[in-house]
């Protein structure tokens, strides 16, 4: 019976998210475009509204047991500026949960396909960048105080037993001399929103997300900076893959009990 209740709650939350996304992407964005001319001001207003919307949805999901979230060291994200933030990407809910706790100076790298939807304009106004944009162009977009969030797998995790990273995140980190903040995400129900945008049928138990912010990684302490850049990138990427595979596997049996932080 409780599973049926959570399934109904999942449908409700999905509808609420969809209506909110359409409203923000069209009506709200249009109003802000009409009355706010300053580009930076427009960006900050939209980022604030999206963050607050996501915080509300995460709270509703917790109240109705759609999923629960356990954070560790998440407050560090709100205090950091000028970092490359990376994370594994096991489900479609990851971005929503993470963005609800990022500071407003964080730029997000989004899938290129989103730029071909009705969300294209609001994505542009929020200062987000496509994942097919080269590192040099991203550098011109970011200010010195900006963070950038990148999912180095390039898509959702397909094989949780061994994560494989693209080199875009480390390439950007090394070329712009920006330290890396790793985020490790583990979900107690691995199939929850892992391969579908929406699944009305709730898992037997309430999914619990364990989201942990790791220590800052300064690549200059890990690799020889006198090596050619391509070798530095390869070595740092290999290091991050090993780090994530070790951390994710060690978390297999340690997902915390259902609660929201």
Predicted segments, located by residue:
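Catalytic core of membrane glycerolipid acyltransferases/transacylases, capturing the structured
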Residues: 29-51, 77-132
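Short, basic/glycine-rich phosphate-binding loops at helix/coil junctions
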Residues: 54-55, 117-122, 212-217
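Short gly/ser/thr-rich secondary-structure transition/capping motifs
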Residues: 64-72, 129-133, 193-196
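Short amphipathic alpha-helical segments and helix-helix/interface helices
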Residues: 58, 96-99, 119-120, 138-139, ...
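Non-catalytic C-terminal accessory region of glycerolipid acyltransferases
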Residues: 134-261
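Membrane-anchoring hydrophobic helices of lipid-metabolizing enzymes
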Residues: 1-82
């Amino acid at each position: 019976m409780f599973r049926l209740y959570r399934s109904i709650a999942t449908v409700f939350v999905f509808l609420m998210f969809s209506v909110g996304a359409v409203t923000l992407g069209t009506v709200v964005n249009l109003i802000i475009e009409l009355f706010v001319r300053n580009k930076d001001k427009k960006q900050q207003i939209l980022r604030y509204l999206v963050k607050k919307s996501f915080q509300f949805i995460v709270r509703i999901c917790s109240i109705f047991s759609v999923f629960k979230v356990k954070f560790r060291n998440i407050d560090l994200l709100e205090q950091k500026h000028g970092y490359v933030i990376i994370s594994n990407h096991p489900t479609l809910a990851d971005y929503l949960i993470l963005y609800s706790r990022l500071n407003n100076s964080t730029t997000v790298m989004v899938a290129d396909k989103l730029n071909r939807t009705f969300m294209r304009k609001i994505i542009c106004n929020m200062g987000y960048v496509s994942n097919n944009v080269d590192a040099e162009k991203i550098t011109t977009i970011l200010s010195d105080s900006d963070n950038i969030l990148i999912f180095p797998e390039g898509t959702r995790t397909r094989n949780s037993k061994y994560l494989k990273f693209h080199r875009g995140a480390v390439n950007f980190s090394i070329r712009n001399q920006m330290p890396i903040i790793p985020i490790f995400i583990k979900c107690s129900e691995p199939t929850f929103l892992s391969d579908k945008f929406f699944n009305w049928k709730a898992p037997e138990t309430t999914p619990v997300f364990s989201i942990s912010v790791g220590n800052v990684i300064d690549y200059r302490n890990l690799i020889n900076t006198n090596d050619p850049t391509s070798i530095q990138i390869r070595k740092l990427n290999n290091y991050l893959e090993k780090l994530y595979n070790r951390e994710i596997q060690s978390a297999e049996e340690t997902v915390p009990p259902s609660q929201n932080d």
